[in-house]
């Protein structure tokens, strides 16, 4: 099991993630895309990465908007696993621009 990060550790790590915030034991972000197809394409790519990492986001999609929250349920908070997936998500989104 991964160790839960302290709020100080989380805030420090978030400095490297533009647009991500910490609240309610999770890190959160949102993205806006050109259209639904682009949003869904990114979601599909994230889904494959999440499966590969065996770590899955809590997310929602309405048309061209995607909201993502990451936490590690076993740790009841945020761990390194969340930041690893967040980095992969950032890379996926960046590669679509």
UniProtKB/Swiss-Prot annotation:
Catalytically driven reaction(s): (4aS,6R)-4a-hydroxy-L-erythro-5,6,7,8-tetrahydrobiopterin = (6R)-L-erythro-6,7-dihydrobiopterin + H2O
Segments crossing the lipid bilayer: none
Keyword Lyase: yes
MF terms (GO), sorted A to Z: 4-alpha-hydroxytetrahydrobiopterin dehydratase activity
UniProt superkingdom: Bacteria
One GO term (biological process): tetrahydrobiopterin biosynthetic process
Keywords per UniProt: Lyase
Enzymatic class: lyase
E.C. designation(s): 4.2.1.96
InterPro entries the UniProt entry points to: PCD_sf (IPR036428), Pterin_deHydtase (IPR001533)
Record family assignment: Belongs to the pterin-4-alpha-carbinolamine dehydratase family.
Protein name (database record): Putative pterin-4-alpha-carbinolamine dehydratase
């Amino acid at each position: 099991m991964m160790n839960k990060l302290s709020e100080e550790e989380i805030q420090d790590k978030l400095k490297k993630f533009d647009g991500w915030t910490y609240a309610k034991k999770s890190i959160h972000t949102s993205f806006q895309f050109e259209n639904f197809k682009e949003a869904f394409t990114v979601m599909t790519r994230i889904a494959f990465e999440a499966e590969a990492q065996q770590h899955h986001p809590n997310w929602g999609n309405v048309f061209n908007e995607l909201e993502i929250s990451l936490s590690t349920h076993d740790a009841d908070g945020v761990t390194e696993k969340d930041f690893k997936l967040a980095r992969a998500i950032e890379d996926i989104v960046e590669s679509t621009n």
